[in-house]
Amino acid sequence: MNTHNARDSDDESPLESEEHLKRFFAGRNLYSQTKIDDARKKSHDAKYAKEVEWDAKDTAKGKPVFKKYRQEIADKTSRCDAQFINNLHTYYGNGSELRELPETHYAVDFMGTTIATTEMTAELKKLKVLKKKTATSQFVREHRQLGFIPTPSRRSLSCTGRFMNFETKCDERPDRTNPEFSVGNNNFLSATISNLDEDFKTPSNCEHVASIVPKEISNALTALIPHVNVFDYEKGEMEIGKVLCSNKNLHAYVIPKQHDQEQMLKDFSARFLAWYNKLSHLQRDTFGTDKDPKRSGKQEDGKPMKPYFWRVNVILCLQEFQEEGTMFRRARHVCGIRPHKSQPGLDLYIEIDTGSMRALKTNYLTVRKLPQEFANVPTPILEVRFEGAKTEEDVARRIAHIRKTGRAYIKSFDTGKRKIYQNSFFNGQPKDWSNIETAVLLPPKESSMSKLFCEDRDCMGLCCTDQWLENAESSPGISTIPASWIADKNKKPFVDRSPQKFKFPASGSYMKPAN
């Protein structure tokens, strides 16, 4: 290898290195080993589903069934995309036929095939391999109560003497104990937005006030999260459809790809229209306005009341979307704007279900305050923060990677008290709320050809390189069927050699435990 060239390649930017990898893989006869493993898992899942169906039928007839199948539980927080999971201690069958229950494994069973019986092996045989990870959790729980472990620790830490004095540093989380953000908060007032999506733009009729709008948009998004319900998400990989923007607090606002925004708009509009039709004529004219009886006569510290729509969640009535069935839309008031001195003032809103910006003239026919009954409808907008990102440049690089790959890895969630706060508005039956406020995203896994395995214990090798095989992949060992066999197939008697469906034996011997 030319060391001079190798040294030059180290100085290449990530984009230049990516182009080098594309040129390296182009035209080569390669295939992905992870796809073989995925096919095996799909085959197993299909067999497992059939057996579960048969088990349900047999159990319904009063026949007890003692079977447990292979359970593959991958680490969803790992950035390795080539994990091979083989949980030996929960593998009681292959999903297509019964297996006798294996004997309990001991630690000594994995040391060798032939081991002399010694005092050490006798002690090892007393240590059973646990099927559930209860011993470690019990150890951590007991020592946490004794004060040896001040904060929750990772399960993978070894239980040594040094572990007793180990102290972990929790990730800093934003203080969300009070859902109402204080106006005197300097960070709140000085916030601005960056890394805007192409579709997330200020409307054309208020471009000249761009110096004011970014700060107000950031404030509106930050205040929106505690006041609107969100979907429940799982840890692990998530497909991101759009990154709206980021702010100076190093948070970003994304819309996962799993949500159909058009369908959400139609569902909400139909739901709101059904609710609206049940109101009386007086309630239809006054709800969510200054004329609402629930609002009249109220003042704040002797000061004039702010408009009913001011920096709260509202309902927009957009006649231009009536034919599409999405006329009624949820939104958050951002700020008031005046395009020109000679023109009347407008108000800027951000839609809760799409993240789109709308500037329109506010009146009783176009804007109403959002009834509390609809606050628990989840929004697809998810607030995220990036683990390890310390500057806005770090956030910009992470957002650029998400927009390029369309994927992100959720490590954990920052939770608040949305459920307690929102249910305080209801005197009757409390509604379902999610306390998820911010998703913590792991740094992206960089593709590397310098090492075969990553740090994940279940890595099969060459992880995170499948993206380079998309255009160069070819299946190994492709075979063709001779034309002569096809011609003679109808002449020869055809014998179905496919395996028959497994049938339970008549006796109950299969339920006896293994010897």
UniProtKB/Swiss-Prot annotation:
Gene Ontology biological process: regulatory ncRNA-mediated gene silencing
Q: Name one GO cellular component term.
A: P-body
Q: What role does this protein play?
A: Together with pid-5, it is involved in gene silencing mediated by a class of 21 nucleotide PIWI-interacting RNAs (piRNAs) that possess a uracil residue at the 5'-end (also called 21U-RNAs) and guide the Piwi protein prg-1 to its DNA targets for silencing. Together with pid-5, it is required for the biogenesis of secondary and tertiary 22G-siRNAs. Specifically, promotes the production of 22G-siRNAs from the 5' end of target mRNAs.
Assembly with partners or alone: May interact with pid-2, app-1 and prmt-5.
The organism named in the record is Caenorhabditis elegans
Query: Which keywords does UniProt give here?
Result: Cytoplasm, RNA-mediated gene silencing
Main location, first listed in the record: cytoplasm
Q: Which domain of life is it from?
A: Eukaryota
Q: What is the lineage of its organism?
A: Eukaryota, Metazoa, Ecdysozoa, Nematoda, Chromadorea
Q: Where in the cell is the protein located?
A: Cytoplasm, Perinuclear region; Cytoplasm, P-body
Q: Where is the stretch described as Disordered?
A: 496-515
- Its name, as the record gives it, is Protein pid-4
**Signal sequence extent:** none
